[in-house]
Amino acid sequence: MSAILSEPLHGGATANAAQSAIDYRPEDPAILANPFPLFDRMRMEDPVHWSPRLKSWVLTRYDDIKRVCLEPARMSSDRLRPFFASIPSEEAKKIGDIMRYLSLWMVFKDAPEHTRLRRLTGKVFHNKSMQAMRPQVDDIAQWLIGRIGDKTEFDFISEFAGPLPCLVIMAMLGVPREDLAQVKRMSDQIALFIGSSRTSSEKYGTAEAATHEMAEYFRHHITLRRTAPRDDLMTELVQLNDNGDTLSDDELIATCILLLFAGHETTTNHIANGMLSLTRFPNEQQKLRVRTSTANQPANAKFAAAAVEELLRYDGPSGAQVRIVAQTHELRGKQLKEGERVFMMLNAANRDPEAYAQPNVLDLDRDGTAHLTFGFGLHICLGFPLARLEGQVAFPALLKRFASVETIGPEPKWINSLVFRGMNALPVRVRRA
């Protein structure tokens, strides 16, 4: 998961940053729709860019971002405390539950707290357990495709890309499918706080209420698991024990919120962005359709897996990951001072020509497994095996059912976020196979 708080910190500037000719306006609709030409320029002219608007450093080169991911001692993942400290006291009072539970998310932790939480949750959330979910993921995908019925025009996000990951995580946690609308609403409202690049007291109140509601929702289900264990991930989390170390009630609630939120928001964008890319490269769409519909099942699965990696590289769901400078040091001649914030633009790294030949071309035969969409190092996304699996199941299933998929209407509107890269809606026209 790549969820962080992305609005500018109050105050703070760096004296050593020379004025750049580049004016990075992340909220500009044109930049939200297509940031890649500007990222190309930043990568060439100012790869360690100081943004006065964000009061932060912005990195765009693959090697620099990978290096930062491997230096947890110099680059801290604990970006909540400086963010909360920057909020005026009156605003901070409005987000007590957000602070309570987000501060327990492992994505905002450094060692040793991160190590402990990762060790515990890794016992139940790993590649083998994710692969065991394949039949359920396929059942959910087929159910959603069946629900589309005979429609030839529909919003791909609301009909498929949105509900799929939410239903998958709900099935894993063992919460009722009938709660989908409530769960999605709570997740979307929390996203207003975590992913938005604009400050708004209204969004604080909305996200705080949603966090409180989701916490009570999971508290109820956790209590049920203690008295009547089930065969689901939530029961496994409740029963975790590593030499006497267990998750506290607040840690259990925070972890469930994290899994649901991350699994929903990020994977929705993964599936939607991937489908948009396939509509823009129709030859690649047809290639994926043909090469995942043969009688050779192992070959189908192998190509589907490779195709998903390329879709994640080309236009993945992650805008940025964030670090806080823990030790003053230099990067490409720029002095990064302790306490300053650093945005690692993952989607820019994935288009770096030093890492990929013809990076702005979608090539499903490319070996794209080295992409940084899920991060790298200690903080690589815990749920990346599940996100990959959902793509490996979803795209072949959709392309088997539909002989063609194309976008309709005006260009999609992209969400105003530095953290997430996704659209509000994706109207499509399909022709049934």
Language-model features: locations:
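Cytochrome P450
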Residues: 1-433
